[in-house]
């Protein structure tokens, strides 16, 4: 499972089940929030700095860091499924606290403060973040149970929550609300997610993950 719907590969990820790296908001009125330090280690992240307007770089960094950190909690390291679910549950509660203006536990404060600023400044839909967490938790449970995806509709539903929210969040940052644009973004993000899955089949199989529709595999005599 991955939030790499924008073809993200990283060489140094946030440590699984550990507190995220520290980061502080800008001090001056209207000053841009510095990029979260850990994000700068991801090899494809400079795309945000090179191609995006300067005012959007910090919000994009905050979204990326949240998604990457949650994804790492779900599938990096050697934690048990229960430990991963507990960590994501803790992050979910902290996210809700941040978005509702309540104090956030120290473990997640530096990760979520820039995200909260981005959400407030750009009116980002809260549900897109919880969709990501839902997808990560589902992936943990299915992997732990040795359960794959019954058919293409089942797999596409997973992409709807694991990949599409990132594209929609980026469109919201740019002020795009047109339904046709959102649907086009969904199609692109889902396609990139599927490509990511299928180019990593050998790696995922060794980790108990299988992102091919089981009905089609059975029809073609494919036994993972």
Give the positions of each predicted feature.
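Acidic catalytic motifs of isoprenoid enzymes
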Residues: 2-20, 24-224
């Amino acid at each position: 499972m991955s939030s790499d719907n924008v073809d993200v590969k990283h060489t140094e990820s946030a440590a699984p089940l550990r507190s995220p790296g520290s980061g502080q908001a800008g001090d001056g009125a209207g000053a841009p929030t510095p990029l979260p330090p850990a994000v700068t280690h991801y090899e494809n992240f400079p795309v945000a700095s090179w191609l995006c307007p300067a005012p959007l770089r910090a919000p994009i960094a905050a979204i990326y860091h949240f998604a990457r950190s949650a994804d790492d909690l779900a599938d990096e390291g050697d934690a048990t499924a229960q430990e991963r679910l507990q960590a994501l549950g803790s992050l979910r509660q902290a996210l809700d606290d941040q978005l509702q203006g309540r104090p956030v536990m120290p473990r997640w404060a530096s990760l979520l403060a820039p995200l909260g600023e981005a959400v407030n400044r750009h009116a980002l839909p809260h549900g897109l973040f919880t969709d990501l967490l839902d997808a990560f938790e589902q992936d943990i449970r299915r992997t732990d149970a040795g359960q794959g995806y019954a058919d293409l509709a089942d797999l596409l539903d997973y992409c709807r929550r694991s990949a599409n929210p990132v594209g929609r969040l980026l469109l919201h940052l740019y002020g795009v609300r047109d339904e046709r644009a959102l649907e086009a973004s969904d199609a692109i993000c889902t396609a990139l997610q599927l490509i990511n899955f299928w180019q990593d089949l050998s790696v995922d199989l060794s980790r108990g993950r299988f992102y091919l529709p089981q009905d089609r595999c059975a029809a073609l005599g494919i036994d993972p």
